[in-house]
């Protein structure tokens, strides 16, 4: 609920991940999850703003099927959905940062890392998500909660590689527009599920940039 719904409804440490590490990443143990996430200072710099506030870490999946039962779009619309991940994952950390820290925010970043039992299962999750996201491109979604319309959103074109999905979208609430980017990526047994939003008209690449930072911080 926190991420895409927050316009109308209601710190971690990080390894030195400025430069790309060499060689393939090792599988990630549960004990390493939190240090992979970016600090508030790093997020402020990346989002070219100040005053981003980090919310407490989340360790469980969400369920918003009551708002969007279409599973092709649910995982593209929201990070860390239980109906999308099922019971295949073994551990996760999610931290939401927004500025100003209120429902009517201007900048939002949701960063999450999810461990799967094996590299193969993590890659399989990305493949399944690619099939779903490809059926939710250039798509309008209008959602109502208790008779109250939530922000409308429209997705753009999907960019896909063998290890990453990138999907831009815009969200509108009255005359307020946000430009957003979703990124879903895999490295070893780790899935990175990221969302970044900035004021309308912005060029948003930060979700993909967070993926690069997290990958660079993984042990080799």
Locations of regions flagged by a protein language model:
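Sec-dependent N-terminal signal peptides
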Residues: 1-5
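Short, well-ordered beta-strand elements
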Residues: 109-112, 185-198
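N-terminal "mature-domain start" segment
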Residues: 15-96
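C-terminal motif of bacterial Sec signal peptides marking the signal peptidase cleavage site
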Residues: 10-13
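A short acidic-to-branched-hydrophobic micro-motif
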Residues: 93-127
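Surface-exposed amphipathic alpha-helical segments
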Residues: 195-220
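Short Gly/Thr-rich strand-loop-strand
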Residues: 58-59, 133-179
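Short, surface-exposed coil-to-beta transition loops
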Residues: 107-110, 176-182
């Amino acid at each position: 609920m926190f991420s895409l719904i927050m316009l109308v409804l209601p710190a971690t440490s990080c390894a030195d991940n400025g430069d790309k590490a060499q060689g393939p990443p090792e599988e990630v143990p549960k004990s390493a999850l939190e240090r992979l996430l970016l600090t508030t200072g790093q997020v402020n710099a990346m989002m070219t703003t100040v005053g981003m506030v980090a919310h407490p870490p989340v360790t469980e999946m969400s369920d918003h099927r009551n708002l969007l039962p279409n599973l092709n779009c649910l995982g593209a619309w929201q990070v860390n959905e239980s109906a999308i991940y099922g019971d295949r994952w073994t551990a996760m950390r999610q931290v939401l940062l927004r500025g100003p820290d209120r429902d009517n925010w201007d900048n939002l970043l949701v960063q999450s890392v999810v461990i799967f039992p094996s590299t193969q299962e993590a890659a399989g999750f990305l493949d399944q998500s690619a099939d779903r996201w490809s059926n939710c491109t250039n798509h309008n979604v209008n959602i109502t909660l208790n008779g109250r319309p939530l922000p409308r959103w429209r997705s753009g074109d999907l960019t896909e590689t063998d290890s990453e999905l990138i999907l831009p979208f815009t969200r509108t609430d009255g005359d307020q527009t946000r430009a957003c980017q979703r990124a879903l990526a895999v490295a070893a047994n780790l899935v990175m599920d990221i969302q970044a939003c900035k004021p309308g008209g912005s060029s948003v690449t930060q979700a993909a940039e967070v993926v690069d930072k997290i990958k660079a911080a993984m042990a080799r």
